[in-house]
């Protein structure tokens, strides 16, 4: 279940970030203007100029066979770059958390097993100013579109123009940081940045901006949804489409980049089919029948008890457990603070005390989950259990009251209940906080300061979400809080999410050890009222803005870690999310005809590196 939440939010927006530890200085600080093959945000790059492949791939993997994967949801577009189809685009086209960039590509590709590091892809060389005021790319002369046309500097210039004019967040807003883009050679293009930019922004241009084909895109209709198979530079082309049901990709035998070091061991299936299902139950049944090749598991009860069918016993279905080295993703109930009922932080804090993790974990999840506490859970970036250091206190000094004392000194933790489902200790604390906020309790109802019964809606989009919402609803009702759970279809959910038309949702945030500009889209004041942004909670706090600025300005590891921890403390103290839980591992079941590399990178398993084994 957790994996489905994370996959949904990953699929609609994945900043080009990876995760690992950080070095002290930017790579090549003494000679950053020299063309090179890689860029690193902090620290040296791990692979030499003559590297042959990423260490988590099998360069000898066979190129054959097919992969059929199921996802929950629907789609009605093949345009992932505009607001209209932001959350209804078919999976796999670009920047997909599971499938990668099958059709569209970026100038450089991130490694999943080292610091925030990018390697050559469409651009064979990169040069960057030591102050990161400009970056210049030299395109690979072999780069071609799927129709055989060369990828040119004009395509890069066109991409900048079209995304600035008609692109969705974050593409359109990002481009305002570019002061000038110019052709500097037959295959070279330079981006010069203005005062809005920061040290991370060149990395985002390199690793997160798609390059689009000027000759194959109609500028007048680019803002529309479309089901026309696109022209891309990636390893796959769209073979067939059944809207809302299925999209099939075919490996391009003429893919220009198949021998690049950054592509060896990837893209091993001749055909990839993504099948859409209404719910996980039907998806799992299809997997059991062998219709699907893999099943990405997020339900601990199912993992523990329902893999008892014959194919498992016969060894034909294999259960794999993968360990990641990145922070746990954040899953939580999200308060929409644009709603007056959630404007008071004491109210949010009180409601956060009323989620009984111990009861839910034992009764719903076979005790497999761990409680999430931090937005960078389980990493050196987490503030939980650590008192603020001198640099953090310096950053936070201008914002008295932004961080609660227990969060500042590292003693804060979510409540641990007796697991009965009706522990009175957190309920009493919640009662006291609501009373301080002006609530009264009459006839079994919580009455807000305006004299109205305290009531709100939790919007969900699946039976699994509804199940955990029901558990929360039960605890809230004990304090007289009336909660209605409204499960809507995927299209309605996406529309309401995009326009912030909800009281509370279950929200998921992908975490990394290299947080950067995506934090503006999640928490920045400027994103609060931007439709399609990921500021689900409606955060608009000067302290948050200042901490984001600090982490982006950091030039060394110590300052970066302090800034992220300070941001973590402000977010925890703001009570914008009720943190729920996470799995300590990744679980994937596969039929034995599918194989994967032995090495798992820091970011976890990488589906684009798997292959088919049958003759």
Swiss-Prot record:
Specify where it is mainly localized: periplasm
Q: Which GO terms describe its molecular function?
A: peptide transmembrane transporter activity
- One Pfam family assigned to this protein is SBP_bac_5
Q: Which domain of life is it from?
A: Bacteria
The record's Gene Ontology cellular component field reads:
ATP-binding cassette (ABC) transporter complex; outer membrane-bounded periplasmic space
| InterPro entries given in the database record | Peptide/Ni-bd, SBP_5, SBP_5_dom
Keywords, alphabetical: Periplasm, Signal, Transport
Family as reported in the entry's similarity comment: Belongs to the bacterial solute-binding protein 5 family.
In Swiss-Prot or TrEMBL terms, this protein is called Putative binding protein BRA0576/BS1330_II0571
Lineage, top ranks: Bacteria, Pseudomonadati, Pseudomonadota, Alphaproteobacteria, Hyphomicrobiales
């Amino acid at each position: 279940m957790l994996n489905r939440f994370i996959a949904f939010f990953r699929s609609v927006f994945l900043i080009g970030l990876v995760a690992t530890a950080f070095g002290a200085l930017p790579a090549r600080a003494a000679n950053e203007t020299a063309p090179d093959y890689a860029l690193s945000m902090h620290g040296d790059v791990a692979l030499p100029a003559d590297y042959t492949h990423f260490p988590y791939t099998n360069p000898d993997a066979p190129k054959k066979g097919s992969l059929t994967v199921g996802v929950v949801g629907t789609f009605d577009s093949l345009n992932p770059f505009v607001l209209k189809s932001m959350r209804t685009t078919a999976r796999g086209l670009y920047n997909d958390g599971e499938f990668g960039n099958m059709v569209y590509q970026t100038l450089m590709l991130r490694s999943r097993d080292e610091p925030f590091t990018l390697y050559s892809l469409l651009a064979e060389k990169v040069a960057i100013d030591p102050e990161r005021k400009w970056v210049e790319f030299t395109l690979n002369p072999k780069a071609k579109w799927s129709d055989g046309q060369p990828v040119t500097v004009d395509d890069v210039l066109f991409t900048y123009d079209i995304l600035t004019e008609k692109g969705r967040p974050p593409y359109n807003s990002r481009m305002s940081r570019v002061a000038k883009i110019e052709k500097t050679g037959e295959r070279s293009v330079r981006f010069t940045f203005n005062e809005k930019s920061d040290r991370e922004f060149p990395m985002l241009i390199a690793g997160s901006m798609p390059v689009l084909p000027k000759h194959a895109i109609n500028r007048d209709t680019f803002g529309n949804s479309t089901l026309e198979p696109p022209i891309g530079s990636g390893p796959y082309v769209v073979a067939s489409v059944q809207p809302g049901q299925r999209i099939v990709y075919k490996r391009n035998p003429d893919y220009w980049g198949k021998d690049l070091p950054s592509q060896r061991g990837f893209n091993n299936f001749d055909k990839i089919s993504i099948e859409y299902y209404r719910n996980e139950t039907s998806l799992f049944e299809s997997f059991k029948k062998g219709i699907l090749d893999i099943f990405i598991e997020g339900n601990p009860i199912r993992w523990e008890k329902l893999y008892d069918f014959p194919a498992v016993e016969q060894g034909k279905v294999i259960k794999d457990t993968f360990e990641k080295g990145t922070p746990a993703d954040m899953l939580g109930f999200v308060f929409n603070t644009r709603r007056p009922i959630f404007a008071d932080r004491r109210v949010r804090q009180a409601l956060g005390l009323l989620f009984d993790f111990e009861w839910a974990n034992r009764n719903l999840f076979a005790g497999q989950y761990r409680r999430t506490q931090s937005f960078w859970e389980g990493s050196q970036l987490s503030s939980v259990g650590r008192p603020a250091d001198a640099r953090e206190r310096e950053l936070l000094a201008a914002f008295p009251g932004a961080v609660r004392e227990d969060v500042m000194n590292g003693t804060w933790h979510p409540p641990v209940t007796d697991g009965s489902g009706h522990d009175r200790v957190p309920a009493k604390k919640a009662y006291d906080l609501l009373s301080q906020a002006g609530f009264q309790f009459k006839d079994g109802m919580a009455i807000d300061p305006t004299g109205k019964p305290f009531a709100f809606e939790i919007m969900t989009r699946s039976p699994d979400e509804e199940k955990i919402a029901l558990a929360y609803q039960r605890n809230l009702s004990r304090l007289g809080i009336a909660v209605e759970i409204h499960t809507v279809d995927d299209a309605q959910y996406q529309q309401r999410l995009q326009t912030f038309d909800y009281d509370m949702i279950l929200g998921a945030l992908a975490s990394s050890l290299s947080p950067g500009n995506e934090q503006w889209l999640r928490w920045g004041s400027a994103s609060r009222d931007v439709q399609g942004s990921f500021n689900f909670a409606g955060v608009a706090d000067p302290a948050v803005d200042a901490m984001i600025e600090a982490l982006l300005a950091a030039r060394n590891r110590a300052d970066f870690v302090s800034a992220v921890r300070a941001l973590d403390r402000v977010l925890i103290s703001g009570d914008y999310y009720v943190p729920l839980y996470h799995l300590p591992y990744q679980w994937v079941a596969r039929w034995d005809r599918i194989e994967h590399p032995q090495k798992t990178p820091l970011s976890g398993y990488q589906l684009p590196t798997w292959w088919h084994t049958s003759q």
